[in-house]
Amino acid sequence: MGLKAAQKTLFPLRSIDDVVRLFAAELGREEPDLVLLSLVLGFVEHFLAVNRVIPTNVPELTFQPSPAPDPPGGLTYFPVADLSIIAALYARFTAQIRGAVDLSLYPREGGVSSRELVKKVSDVIWNSLSRSYFKDRAHIQSLFSFITGTKLDSSGVAFAVVGACQALGLRDVHLALSEDHAWVVFGPNGEQTAEVTWHGKGNEDRRGQTVNAGVAERSWLYLKGSYMRCDRKMEVAFMVCAINPSIDLHTDSLELLQLQQKLLWLLYDLGHLERYPMALGNLADLEELEPTPGRPDPLTLYHKGIASAKTYYRDEHIYPYMYLAGYHCRNRNVREALQAWADTATVIQDYNYCREDEEIYKEFFEVANDVIPNLLKEAASLLEAGEERPGEQSQGTQSQGSALQDPECFAHLLRFYDGICKWEEGSPTPVLHVGWATFLVQSLGRFEGQVRQKVRIVSREAEAAEAEEPWGEEAREGRRRGPRRESKPEEPPPPKKPALDKGLGTGQGAVSGPPRKPPGTVAGTARGPEGGSTAQVPAPTASPPPEGPVLTFQSEKMKGMKELLVATKINSSAIKLQLTAQSQVQMKKQKVSTPSDYTLSFLKRQRKGL
């Protein structure tokens, strides 16, 4: 069985718009042809990013010239995907899979696939790969790379297994994605899971096994069960997100960037990115590079990605916040960047750091020990320059420098490190070492003592006491959302920010409740000694609340450093010792839910990418 007549009429594909039309036609079907679409994308990517030299010895291969926007008057060449080329690749893949898998040997009770059948398909893909190649190299994620070069990266193997299953008519086998790994789900309602590829640098073979162990150990790699369970349209979105436009370390293909951007907007308009937070972040990054007229701005898309993670994945995804923080960092929005990084750490604090979580560790390590220190260093330089030459700086530059005078920025920095420390607690692998401590001290030193002292750090005991007050719940809710600026008695409460902040445990902008009243009194009135008439007397005035944000630490290490962090002078030796020391408290073992709990709870909601 080859390409359908309706598919053939769309060829040849001579431009980006032709490829978009093919994808639109496939997305209009119940079952988009993953093999066809992956072959087309791989073909285009190969000749736009891998081999940009126009070959003269391949008679079937031609390139379509078109005007280039830069430089004016120049030409750009698009590889023409002729039907004969794509059909031959398609026939080769389907023949290879159908010739190697005898479906009669694997009965499908109830029309669903068995683990043995899924394992067999993965064996076919696995055994067809070259024995030795660099598995992290670029441009080996598509079926075009598999057919023409017998090379695939880790996620490419998982996608190839799903594509092969579709070619065999196994419609219950779908792609499952965390933020750094891929496997498959199958069976009734997609309840079964199976590893089909490797992860990381090693080639440890766990194919055929479930992912339940990874879910139970609360590793980030498996997202505690809050991973994406793709349908066919989301699998198309995955292959679009996997497009790699890089020609080399310093150059991207503009044609591939445009193709990826247009395809993502097509998927967005059809509603297929609603449950795909990282695809929304990817699209936002592309819009930042080249805005599309009449489309949502990047900031809106970043927040849509965060909202998707909150709605469908229990707010347990890291990268939606990383995308947002990166945007603010590039635009030198220091306060917003620190808040987004703090939100990221608040998500990671509920995970255990395991040996296969190296990728997210490297992300946090770079943020803590490179990006934040340099951002604060630049802000300090601008602040110093502004003090020496007032009035000469732009408003944005002044805002960046003033971040070091904002206690909320300092509170976000503390919340970021608190999340990292909490992540380490109870984990089988330590996170923090002296390198972290050195840059923590450096970042703390960017804030003057009087700024740091405006942050009020409270203990859980104080929270419990406030629970007795009539307004204690509101205050506690604000604390769970992270640092907040308290309203002064003589000022009206600040307006609430748009609902773009992180939810429980991370946001900002909650306002404190009314001042406390002594028990048994009502503001503005006092009962006379005989209990008769009431006389208007001033109510007892409570001491004004602190001006700065209020913060509750979750980690034992940060609780132990509470006084050191807000001291007038920074005791770097004590902070380094405390941060790198093993926790002195006996951590309670977290009750691990059974793997089925995660699976079933997720299926009641139903729903990235790499």
Swiss-Prot record:
Subcellular location(s) of the protein: Nucleus
Phosphoserine PTM positions: S487, S543
Effect of mutating C241F: In MEN1; loss of interaction with KMT2A and JUND
Region (Interaction with FANCD2): 214-390
Region (Disordered): 460-552
Composition bias type Basic and acidic residues, residue spans: 484-500
Mutation effect (L286P): In MEN1; almost no effect on JUND-binding
Outcome following mutation: L152W: In parathyroid tumors; somatic
Protein name per the record: Menin
